[in-house]
């Protein structure tokens, strides 16, 4: 499994990649593997400000539906439109083309509370 060191992670298996004033959010390689084949991504929070740990959408696999949680507080600037026709991108490229949302950070200090790649690996090894 792949856990890029330049990302931060949550205990709920989301990742965040900060690029200047914006950040991209997705689910981890571990999470997509546990969910199995992703068939639908439902995110209706574009344009809204969502608090840390609140639900920003759902992701549907063949066997289950899971909530998606905000890793930090922020405004949802964009939803990955490619996932509408190709939700399998989450399975194929969880940290690249399979990103879920682009956000503007409300409180960058919340990033310090997230897990490093090393700490996330320890979490899922339990």
Curated annotation (Swiss-Prot):
Domain of life of the native organism: Bacteria
A single Gene Ontology CC term: cytosol
Residue ranges constituting the Lipoyl-binding domain according to the UniProt record: 22-104
Disulfide bonds: none
Keyword line: Lipoyl
Positions bearing N6-lipoyllysine: 63
One Pfam family hit: GCV_H
GO-annotated biological processes: glycine decarboxylation via glycine cleavage system
Names of required cofactors: (R)-lipoate
Record text on cofactor binding: Binds 1 lipoyl cofactor covalently.
Subunit and partners: The glycine cleavage system is composed of four proteins: P, T, L and H.
Similarity comment: Belongs to the GcvH family.
PANTHER family linked: GLYCINE CLEAVAGE SYSTEM H PROTEIN (PTHR11715), GLYCINE CLEAVAGE SYSTEM H PROTEIN-RELATED (PTHR11715:SF3)
Chain's role: The glycine cleavage system catalyzes the degradation of glycine. The H protein shuttles the methylamine group of glycine from the P protein to the T protein.
The protein, known as: Glycine cleavage system H protein
Organism name: Parabacteroides distasonis (strain ATCC 8503 / DSM 20701 / CIP 104284 / JCM 5825 / NCTC 11152)
The gene coding this protein: gcvH
């Amino acid at each position: 499994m792949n856990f890029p060191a330049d990302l931060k992670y949550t205990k709920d298996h989301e990742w965040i990649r900060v690029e200047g004033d914006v950040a991209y959010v997705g689910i981890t390689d571990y999470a997509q593997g546990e969910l199995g084949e992703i068939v639908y991504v439902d995110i209706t929070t574009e344009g809204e400000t969502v608090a840390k740990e609140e639900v920003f959408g759902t992701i549907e696999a063949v066997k289950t539906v899971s909530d998606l949680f905000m890793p930090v507080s922020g405004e949802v600037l964009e939803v990955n439109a490619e996932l509408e026709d190709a939700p399998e991108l989450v399975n194929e490229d969880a940290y690249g083309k399979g990103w879920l949302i682009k956000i503007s950070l409300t409180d960058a200090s919340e990033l310090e509370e997230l897990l490093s790649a090393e700490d996330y690996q320890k979490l899922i090894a339990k």
